[in-house]
Amino acid sequence: MNKLPHETRVVIGMSGGVDSSVAALLLKEQGYDVIGIFMKNWDDTDENGVCTATEDYNDVIEVCNQIGIPYYAVNFEKQYWDKVFTYFLDEYRAGRTPNPDVMCNKEIKFKAFLEHAIALGADYVATGHYARVAYMDGEYKMLRGVDDNKDQTYFLNQLSQEQLSKTMFPLGELKKPQIREMAKEAGLATAAKKDSTGICFIGERNFKDFLSNYLPAQPGVMQTLSGEVKGKHDGLMYYTIGQRHGLGIGGNGDPWFAVGKNLKENILYVDQGFHNELLYGDEVIATNVGWVSNKEKETEFKCTAKFRYRQEDNKVTVQIVDENTVRILCDEPIRAITPGQAVVFYDGDECLGGATIDEVYRSGKKLDYLG
């Protein structure tokens, strides 16, 4: 039997930002029994002993008091370290470029947090993500958020039927300017707060400095695939495929880009030109596949795919290799497909699921120089 809103408990994850603040406000206005939870996933005390999470939690407290909902802080630092940060370091160690946001959603926000919320008697969890959940054809579907510029289904691609059945995304039908306006009209403390960018546990810190605290940097040679030495790199983990900035190669002609890595010999491969052929692939093997639907997939189907966040949709053919692996054939060659990153599949507005990019090919030949 469906419960009325006032009988339905929704536990919302609140970050201290404007999105989750407005999501909580909307749920409260819709009559739900709302509880705000601040997740502390990382000990981010800086060298002066200042913890930025404390400021964010203070904003959560202020907003919850303004809205009139109870709030708690929950510590998930151990789970985050074990499930997200360890993976993050392992991927960099392997010369790949990880996507911690995907793992955080899968393991923390929609697993550890969901379990905690259910223990609090929650019927649903909610977050400030730009995405939508719909129940159609006997199952839950995840749809892109209405705001194309903010859609976050790319990062939510590993969510299951079970997780979606317990999830609400109050902002899915709204656009960012509307959300700012709502926060302003309601006088919320976070109305003018700047959006956070980058990886949550690094924050405003320098990426190189942060990473070197956990992984020793191993400087090495920077050269073309034909062996022409162009300089030295600071450590392979600091570079991603297609990167231009930070190479420090002068001279005339087209700009230089990172085109590959040789982990064994600690070489960073570089070459000139944004549209350099070395940066393009047309076939991908991806692993750690997760589908939103439990329905059996055809062994081969056409859809679109994003190989990185905010990329345009690319037409592809997906071939199921086994339950953990897919082969992706691209209609057109795609630039800078990066091992370790997520590839996410779509059918129109519906997010079908995703996987981790493992191997890249061009014209049937594996691009070994990608690492």
Swiss-Prot record:
GO terms for cellular component: cytoplasm. It catalyses: S-sulfanyl-L-cysteinyl-[protein] + uridine(34) in tRNA + AH2 + ATP = 2-thiouridine(34) in tRNA + L-cysteinyl-[protein] + A + AMP + diphosphate + H(+). Signal peptide: none annotated. SUPFAM superfamilies: Adenine nucleotide alpha hydrolases-like (SSF52402). The record marks 129, 341 as: Interaction with tRNA. Residues 99-101 are annotated as: Interaction with target base in tRNA. Its EC number is 2.8.1.13. Keywords: ATP-binding, Cytoplasm, Disulfide bond, Nucleotide-binding, RNA-binding, Transferase, tRNA processing, tRNA-binding. It comes from the Bacteria. It is found in: Cytoplasm. GO terms for molecular function: ATP binding; tRNA binding; tRNA-uridine 2-sulfurtransferase activity. The active site is at residues 104, 200. The keyword Plastid does not apply. GO terms for biological process: tRNA wobble position uridine thiolation. Disulfide bonds join 104-200. ATP binds at residues 13-20, 39, 128. InterPro entries: MnmA-like, MnmA-like_C, MnmA-like_central, MnmA-like_central_sf, Rossmann-like_a/b/a_fold. Residues 150-152, 308-309 are annotated as: Interaction with tRNA. Belongs to the MnmA/TRMU family. Catalyzes the 2-thiolation of uridine at the wobble position (U34) of tRNA, leading to the formation of s(2)U34. This is tRNA-specific 2-thiouridylase MnmA. It comes from Bacillus cereus (strain ATCC 14579 / DSM 31 / CCUG 7414 / JCM 2152 / NBRC 15305 / NCIMB 9373 / NCTC 2599 / NRRL B-3711). The gene is mnmA.
